Amino acid sequence: MAESKPTPQSTFTGPIVVDPITRIEGHLRIMVEVENGKVKDAWSSSQLFRGLEIILKGRDPRDAQHFTQRACGVCTYVHALASSRCVDDAVKVSIPANARMMRNLVMASQYLHDHLVHFYHLHALDWVDVTAALKADPNKAAKLAASIAPARPGNSAKALKAVQDKLKAFVESGQLGIFTNAYFLGGHKAYYLPPEVDLIATAHYLEALHMQVKAASAMAILGGKNPHTQFTVVGGCSNYQGLTKDPLANYLALSKEVCQFVNECYIPDLLAVAGFYKDWGGIGGTSNYLAFGEFATDDSSPEKHLATSQFPSGVITGRDLGKVDNVDLGAIYEDVKYSWYAPGGDGKHPYDGVTDPKYTKLDDKDHYSWMKAPRYKGKAMEVGPLARTFIAYAKGQPDFKKVVDMVLGKLSVPATALHSTLGRTAARGIETAIVCANMEKWIKEMADSGAKDNTLCAKWEMPEESKGVGLADAPRGALSHWIRIKGKKIDNFQLVVPSTWNLGPRGAQGDKSPVEEALIGTPIADPKRPVEILRTVHAFDPCIACGVHVIEPETNEILKFKVC
């Protein structure tokens, strides 16, 4: 069906600044140097100082989860989970099986929610021209949808025509809202989906708005609320009602509805769009991958978490899928040489991390980010869906092998094509399909366990002095919270988050972060509308671009755009 084209490339030479790229979980500024239409160098700068580590110092360790969740309004639960796990480790408590399974189920809903939101509402519009859907033939679009996905009412010619009519009225009103000044308006060389695919994707974009609510509602059934769940406690969970029949039945019903959309829309849409952009299987790659693993069958310690996660943990270096190393938590450290922090913090393990801000100036390539630069044995590591997918695939995990091979077969590309922006985007769909395939089984396991024994929380005592680490593999990637307790209070707390791994600055040796590495070689068709930069950066899921400033190198004119 798909006819992939080569990505167009200009002859432009000069700098481009995209600022800000995201309005969630920090404001991101990307600066690149372009030579003959390709990115030659890149700098990733976080513009938001967080300071949660400073806020937490001196507080009760049990309070950590309530503060750290506020780092983000999208992937909120993962910080509660990592904080709870790090205090679990510090007090040396082994949580009950019911608590482990309930925590895992809420994480499963987080995956469904985040990956759907990312594909349709944060990333798809880097590839899909919404206004081009007006040129589509709804009958052809319906036939195309029937050829790539199971029959469903929303894919009928009548339903697609209704979406097209709604879109037409929206465009003719002149009030384009979130699409105002979008890169695809007026046409763009880098957008080349057939109008029928644009129409199908736009219809599912709208439907996905309802699906994300259902996924969030499922999280709230077990988590108490969304965002910012309130069911995790040190030693387990507090939602005893979540073990009973009606809440679990409601959770299952919502999950089934979301997963039906995943299988009938998300995966077919992903494959359809990717089929027209297959050359992006050679753009945006990195070299090294790290995963802490998730959905563990034994969470009694960080070591057990690493060893028993159903989404496996591991380390891959140099793209060598023939060798997956075990994770050594002692090999993680953070550099601050290129960050806006006082010197002396380089090479610090998170237990000993120092957060001492020292801002210089914006246009400073020696110090240019509020993020630190995490490294593993001296190497920058990509974390997230692609890292998890490669590690699971290389380890021969059956679920991953089945879905990855299906995707590779449908696209007729080798596994090496996944080292890319395209692969990073596909990996999210792969994971979502696997979560859906296991969801009903996981729910039944908890229901059966809870029917026999409803224990949800284990007893423990706060030590005078201790330390602990909480590991999680959030939808965006490897997350770790590190705590030192002294006098039963937080003496030091450090968060090493996925965006820090992926989007941080250079390390002490001048080595680029994953996003900086991934941007090298990216072709730019139109330097005033550099959608290609957004494609690669958004593939790491720093969320959504709300405003872009592109600096024209000769006149220093700042061109302002709002980007969807």
From Swiss-Prot:
- Annotated Ni(2+) binding sites: 72, 75, 543, 546
Q: Which domain of life is it from?
A: Bacteria
Q: Which cofactor does it need?
A: Ni(2+)
Keywords attached to this entry: Metal-binding, Nickel, Oxidoreductase, Periplasm
The protein's location, in the record's own words, is: Periplasm
Tell me the GO molecular function terms.
Answer: cytochrome-c3 hydrogenase activity; ferredoxin hydrogenase activity; nickel cation binding
GO cellular component annotations of the record: periplasmic space
Give the EC number.
Answer: 1.12.2.1
Q: Please write the reaction equations for the catalytic activity of this protein.
A: 2 Fe(III)-[cytochrome c3] + H2 = 2 Fe(II)-[cytochrome c3] + 2 H(+)
Would the keyword Oxidoreductase be found if you checked this record's keyword annotation?
Answer: yes
Q: How is the cofactor bound?
A: Binds 1 nickel ion per subunit.
Q: Name one Pfam family in it.
A: NiFeSe_Hases
Q: Which residues form the propeptide?
A: 550-564
Main localization category: periplasm
Q: Does the keyword Oxidoreductase apply?
A: yes
UniProt lists the family membership as follows: Belongs to the [NiFe]/[NiFeSe] hydrogenase large subunit family.
Q: What else is known?
A: Perhaps the leader of the small subunit serves as a transport vehicle for both subunits.
**Subunit relationships:** Heterodimer of a large and a small subunit.
Q: What is this protein called?
A: Periplasmic [NiFe] hydrogenase large subunit
